[in-house]
Amino acid sequence: MAAKKISKKEIIHYYDSTEVDYKLIWDLNKSYAMHFGYWDKKVKNFPQSLQRENEILAEKVKIKNSDIVLDAGCGVGGSAIFLAKKFGCKVIGITLSKRQADKATNNAKQKGVAHLAEFRVMDFEKMTFPDKAFDVIWAIESICHADSKKRFIEEAYRILRKGGRLVIADAFLTKENVTADEEIILNKFLFGWGVNYLETVKNFNKYLRTTGFRTITFTDVTNNVMPSSKRLYRFSIPAMYIGKFAEFFKMRTKTQNGNIIAAHYQHKALVRGLGKYGIFYAEKSSAIS
């Protein structure tokens, strides 16, 4: 699948202009979350699934009160605020969007954790943090936007301390070579959400290993996000028709309608097995010099 070059400015524009959609159907004003969510026996409704994904990742990476955590691609602060409130740890969230960073800062103030959670505008492929600055790097559905997944992994390794932990929840390709029909589905899914390309699990694992990470695990949780995927798909069916009408009368933009189209085709991609949703965990050795 050929990668399309989507600029950082286009990614910022996507998130800033589609915030209204996340507010309408994704509980953004209450959850501060923009991720799929995680469904298991503990989850009874959609808002709970959003919170549950934070809990699952926190368990996976074993967050402690003493940790300094980087939320790479923090959105409006949902995960960082969750970690600060639940564990009392220090969290720095970074995002390309100043609008998101400002909203995240305000959200942290409203939740009483501004002393623990701070937010900055920064590109996670070119971070300005010093070496060995963090105990944990956390990324939910953000590394998909990286121009180079390998470059992010190298940066993550650089800024992690000895024994530091990395946890990533995201979508991954199941194969590198796709048919023309499959490529159409993937393009509508990815480009509508401001994503250049997805990496395969095999390649992502290789980048982690060759960079120096150890104790690498990947957990396929596609079934746990499928209820949210179906929810998006159901919303997208009427929304695509309404969106075309609204765009004709300049009530919605092409980017906003691309968001709806992506919501439709993400489910088709998962159902056809073109992609999977999973959680990577890796550690930086505590024995390195």
Annotate each PLM feature:
Residues N196-G212:
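Short alpha-helix
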Residues F172-V195, L208:
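Short, glycine-/aromatic-enriched active-site segment of Class I SAM-dependent methyltransferases
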Residues I68-L70, C74-K126:
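Class I SAM-dependent methyltransferase SAM/SAH-binding core
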Residues K150-R165:
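A short glycine-rich, Lys/Arg-flanked "PGG" loop and its adjoining helix->strand segment in the class I
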